[in-house]
């Protein structure tokens, strides 16, 4: 009966402790991890009674974190109202008694913290320049888009204007249209907001398109100058045979492919750079810096192009078309003699058309030189005096550089419509048809028919359309394209 004594002692202890502890002891004896967690949670916290002064050592995950201190750019504004992140702001020193506003927590993704700067509103000192740039850009954009579209549509839809000469002018208008439509909004948006649309892609594509447009203009002027020289020195009759569509496309392909091949280094030269500023946050800018990931041979070629870019730009895209045009005009004047003298094989209307075409080439060259001269001057100044100029001056020179290209694309079609009589007459007829479509009558229709017949007579006798009125029997019949 000795084994009954330990059992009796155990029962007495259990009765003295209580039934709640019995259930806890039974669960603990089963060895469950869940019982241990519940027992730890049911225990009173350490220091609740005897360790009251150690309460400041408690770790609360929701407390305000002072370090690392977030960056507060001056131009940024929080997207949400100021809310205290600490559960007890009075302990953190951000009480209402101090009179200071609560600081916001700027931790998060950059897209949530950064905002696009809008200098247009509220109106400040920089708003006037932003409005001036936008107004100038809108005028250039509207004039250039309407003018270039008009030239392309007139050449495309008119049977009497489909020639190699007018096709070159239409391709010139197409490239100017692309530059104005795609590059102008990106440049103006970057100038106003200091943020770059499409990022690194636009930094490479915009210079490529602008240089390609300059190349198309350069080679087009050279081709037109060669054509004038060929006409002046040719012994063929004044009326030339029809030029097939394949020949026209081949000439345009040479101009386009050559221009884009010369502009390929621009894709490897430019890249996007982001600079933090104390007033405007992060500012996007495009810099000439080849990527270090390029192969060694290609990297050396791009660096060589960067070092020689200024003089290559000046020689190929400025001096070449001007020298070509001046030389061809001097040779043409030398062959034809003084203006009062008329060659035996050319007289009357044909001589007038020849002088008109020469005036067109000279006018295009003068406009091109006038628009590209500021760009070349800015390139030379930046290349030799960039270390002595401020950042604002460099930005202004870059803006002038861009706008000179946009001015060229907007003025060129206006000049073509004013100098070239067939293009200008077709544009006026199109405008009159659009404006007076509902008020037409018998007299108006007869006037329109007479105007059309007059235009056809003028154009068919000019060099713009190579098909003669009475073609030789050996020439194939059909349209030029």
From Swiss-Prot:
Which GO terms fall under molecular function for this chain's record? G protein-coupled peptide receptor activity; G protein-coupled receptor activity; peptide binding; prosaposin receptor activity
Extract the InterPro entries matched here: GPCR_Rhodpsn, GPCR_Rhodpsn_7TM, GPR37_orph
Q: Which residues lie on this side of the membrane: Cytoplasmic?
A: 156-167, 227-251, 332-360, 420-481
SUPFAM superfamilies reported for this sequence = Family A G protein-coupled receptor-like
For this UniProt entry, which segments traverse the membrane?
135-155, 168-188, 206-226, 252-272, 311-331, 361-381, 399-419
What does its PTM field state?
Undergoes metalloprotease-mediated cleavage which reduces its constitutive activity. Ubiquitinated.
Q: Which family, according to the similarity comment?
A: Belongs to the G-protein coupled receptor 1 family.
Q: What role does it play? A: G-protein coupled receptor. Has been shown to bind the neuroprotective and glioprotective factor prosaposin (PSAP), leading to endocytosis followed by an ERK phosphorylation cascade. However, other studies have shown that prosaposin does not increase activity. It has been suggested that GPR37L1 is a constitutively active receptor which signals through the guanine nucleotide-binding protein G(s) subunit alpha. Participates in the regulation of postnatal cerebellar development by modulating the Shh pathway.
Subunit details: Interacts with the PTCH1 receptor.
What UniProt notes about the protein's domains is:
The N-terminal region is required for constitutive signal transduction.
Which protein, by its recorded name, is this? Answer: G-protein coupled receptor 37-like 1
Q: Which organism is it from?
A: Rattus norvegicus
Supply the source organism's classification: Eukaryota, Metazoa, Chordata, Craniata, Vertebrata
